[in-house]
Design a protein with these regions (language model features):
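Conserved ABC ATPase signature
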Residues: 134-138, 142
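Conserved ABC ATPase "signature" region
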Residues: 111-129
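A short, proline-enriched helix->beta-strand linker immediately N-terminal to the Walker B motif
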Residues: 153-157
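Helix N-cap at the start of a conserved alpha-helix in ABC-type nucleotide-binding domains
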Residues: 170-172
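Catalytic Walker B motif of ABC-type/P-loop ATPase nucleotide-binding domains
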Residues: 159-162
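Conserved ABC transporter NBD signature motif
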Residues: 56-64
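Helix-to-loop junction immediately C-terminal to a conserved catalytic motif
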Residues: 48
């Protein structure tokens, strides 16, 4: 389990995260939701150690990630898979080379083993046959699936996704949501997703943390989102595409 205890983060005089305490459940699809500028990305970057909190603790199974040595943090990050807003693929590498890249860098596997593992991950995201294509030759949705395959190639315990549906059409977004949800269950990964897409929230959200102006306003599951008595959350929900007339 990931526990966040009284996290603050400031940039100069601007306080971006304000006393956030929450938990992210093991083997579940955890969503951090909120409008743009709410602090979602700053919180996620703090969780993975790309930013140091001004104050507070981030605990992985009871171990304080913030106070770990540099060496221990590096080892800890190898248990994390990451998917960014853009697919962040290497244009000069083929699809299978992109997926294999973490193994090439950090594993002791033979080339044949690395290639086989990369192929397994591509098959899992339904990209069999695209191995030798380059990122510029495939669609944005396919690029996101390559990014997912790369993120899970080293069998991470935690999967962090920053706006994985950014720039995608609704149909493709649904495919990505379903893929992340099924991989979470199949591999028993603890998945944390930043999003402001209420379709994702209502589709795959098992543990939902709502952030507004750097503060945690509400936490629950998708079944209780609509019935929430939190006015700020209600405003976000009813302003979304879920309730817009066609």
């Amino acid at each position: 389990m990931i526990e966040v205890q009284h996290i603050y983060k400031s940039f100069g005089n601007k306080e971006v995260l304000k006393d956030i305490s929450t938990t992210f459940e093991d083997g579940k699809t955890n969503l951090i939701i909120g409008q743009s500028g709410a602090g979602k990305t700053v919180l996620m970057r703090t969780l993975v150690g790309l930013l140091e909190p001004t104050k507070g603790e981030v605990l992985y199974d009871g171990r304080n990630f913030v106070s770990m040595s540099k060496k221990d943090k590096i080892l800890m990050r190898r248990e994390m898979g990451m998917i960014f807003q853009g697919a962040a693929l290497f244009d000069s590498l083929s699809v299978i080379e992109n997926v294999r890249f973490p193994l090439d860098m950090f594993s002791n596997m033979t080339f044949r083993e690395r290639q086989q593992r990369a192929q397994e991950c591509l098959d899992r995201v339904n990209l069999t046959g695209a191995e030798n294509k380059y990122p510029g030759e495939i669609s944005g949705g396919m690029q996101k699936r390559v990014a997912i395959a790369r993120a899970v190639v080293m069998n991470p315990k935690y999967l962090f996704c920053d706006e994985p549906n950014s720039g995608l059409d609704p149909k493709t977004s649904l495919v990505i949501d379903d893929l992340l949800s099924s991989i979470t269950k199949e591999y028993h990964i603890t998945t944390i997703i930043n999003t402001h897409d209420m379709n994702s929230v209502m589709g795959i959200g098992e543990n939902i943390i709502f952030i507004c102006d750097g503060k945690k306003e509400w936490q629950g599951n998708k079944e209780t989102v609509i019935s929430s008595h939190n006015q700020k959350l209600n405003d976000l929900v009813f302003a979304s595409d879920l309730f817009k007339k066609v």
